[in-house]
């Protein structure tokens, strides 16, 4: 009997759509002269690919609307996290379709290509047949991870190492977090590649990161007499799992009253956080780890600012690579994040500004910078803003809240949780108001 993996023999729960069956095969009729069914197949597929990239309902609907206008079709769209329901009207006929994706994720490289496709549609694709357009969409749809699992593991290692410093950790915590996060995300990427379910991916990768951090700390204790107080950094080794994209896009969707998409994305992000923090808490109990405070680094204000700028750059760069951004796009997001996150931290330290207010200021700055840069290089705004502020998402606060809930220290748990919620609310608000100030199409209710 052949040795087949489960993914080779199991029946797919989401059947693939034969898109080319909806296009005329004679190759003589351009898409703008085609029938409503053929036009709807192109419009729906564009929306579905946009949705699979992780972008919000506003961007998905905008892209579908632009194609509809070019094709002489009226389109109404309802967008969720995993599915799209839309209706197309041409004055004579009406077609309703419900489309869904098998899994959700983030792919900023594919999103960039799709935005170029939509922008160029009036000049290029509108003069092609439906079959030719679907072939081009086939090519874009094949853009999967442009980095190997090893490189994505390295990106997570760099991001979490930088994150550790920004949260107050020292060199030892940074080194241990580098190793543990790198291996943890490598495992997570491998599991995703083999299509394992979400809960299993989170549980295994988080457990592995905690175990590796504790194991290497124990080795360092025995070999170099490193004190056990450095166990505080184990939290930082699992911050690669933070669902920054769905958290932020949910806020943007809610701001535009796309309640279905916003609430579904928020629920998805909460699921990831709850599963991750629960397994991290269980591992902490098994390994006897405690989320203690970091030791004071005793840095001068100027040196601290310089290091914050550097670490913010590398932290955002790492997260952006994990979102499948090309290196130039990741570097651009990293420059924005270095400025915005350092501003946030300095406002807290130098002015005593509450952390949520500083988070709003940092996110607003990131949004304004991204809008300015978008005008010059054409990168999708969300591909710059979300990576640049994901480093501000209070993963440490969320974990400490769940940890204290677990040990029934309810007063501390509520305090950490309230602080986290305030910051999580402030971050998308900053991006939303930056968008309102710089994008007139977003400013009005249409």
Regions found by a protein language model. Give the residues of each.
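Soluble N-terminal domains of membrane-associated systems
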Residues: 1-135, 139-141
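Hydrophobic, membrane-facing alpha-helical anchors
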Residues: 121-136, 150-161, 178-188, 284-291, ...
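Alpha-helical membrane-inserting segments
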Residues: 162-167, 183-192, 208, 212-220, ...
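Structural signature of hydrophobic alpha-helical transmembrane segments
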Residues: 166-180, 229-243, 295-311, 351-365, ...
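Generic multipass alpha-helical transmembrane bundles of integral membrane proteins
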Residues: 240-245, 268-350
């Amino acid at each position: 009997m052949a040795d087949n993996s489960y993914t080779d023999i199991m029946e797919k729960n989401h059947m693939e759509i034969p898109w080319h069956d909806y296009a005329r095969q004679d190759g003589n009729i351009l898409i703008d002269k085609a029938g409503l069914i053929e036009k709807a197949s192109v419009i729906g597929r564009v929306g579905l690919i946009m949705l699979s990239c992780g972008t919000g309902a506003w961007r998905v609907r905008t892209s579908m609307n632009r194609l509809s206008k070019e094709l002489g079709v009226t389109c109404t769209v309802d967008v969720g996290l995993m599915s799209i329901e839309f209706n197309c009207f041409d004055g004579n006929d009406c077609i309703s379709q419900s489309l869904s994706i098998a899994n959700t994720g983030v792919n900023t490289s594919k999103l960039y290509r799709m935005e170029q496709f939509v922008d160029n549609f009036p000049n290029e694709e509108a003069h092609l047949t439906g079959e030719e357009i679907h072939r081009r969409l086939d090519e874009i749809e094949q853009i999967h991870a442009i980095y190997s699992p090893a490189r994505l593991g390295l990106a997570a290692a760099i991001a979490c190492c930088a994150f550790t410093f920004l949260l107050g950790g020292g060199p030892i915590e940074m080194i241990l977090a580098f190793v543990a996060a790198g291996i943890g995300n490598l495992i997570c990427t491998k599991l995703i590649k083999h299509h394992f379910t979400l809960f299993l991916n989170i549980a295994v990768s988080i457990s592995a990161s905690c175990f590796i951090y504790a194991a290497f700390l124990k080795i360092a204790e025995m070999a170099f007499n490193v004190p056990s107080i450095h166990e505080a950094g184990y939290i930082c080794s699992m911050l690669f799992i933070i669902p920054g994209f769905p958290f932020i896009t949910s806020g943007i969707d809610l701001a535009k009253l796309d309640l279905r998409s916003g609430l579904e994305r928020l629920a998805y992000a909460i699921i990831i956080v709850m599963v991750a923090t629960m397994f991290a808490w269980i591992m902490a109990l098994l390994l006897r780890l405690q989320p203690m405070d970091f030791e004071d680094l005793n840095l001068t204000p100027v040196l601290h600012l310089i290091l914050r700028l550097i670490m913010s750059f590398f932290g955002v760069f790492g997260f952006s690579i994990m979102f499948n951004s090309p290196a130039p796009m990741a570097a651009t997001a990293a420059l924005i994040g270095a400025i915005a996150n350092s501003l946030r931290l300095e406002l807290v330290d130098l002015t005593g500004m509450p952390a949520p207010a500083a988070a709003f200021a940092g996110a607003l700055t990131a949004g304004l910078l991204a809008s300015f840069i978008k005008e010059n290089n054409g990168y999708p705004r969300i591909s710059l803003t979300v990576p640049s502020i994901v480093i501000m998402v209070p993963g440490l606060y969320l974990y400490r809240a769940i940890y204290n809930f677990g040990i029934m220290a309810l007063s501390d748990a509520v305090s950490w949780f309230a602080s986290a919620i305030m910051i999580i609310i402030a971050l998308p608000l900053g991006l939303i108001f930056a968008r309102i100030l710089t994008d007139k199409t977003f400013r009005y209710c249409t």
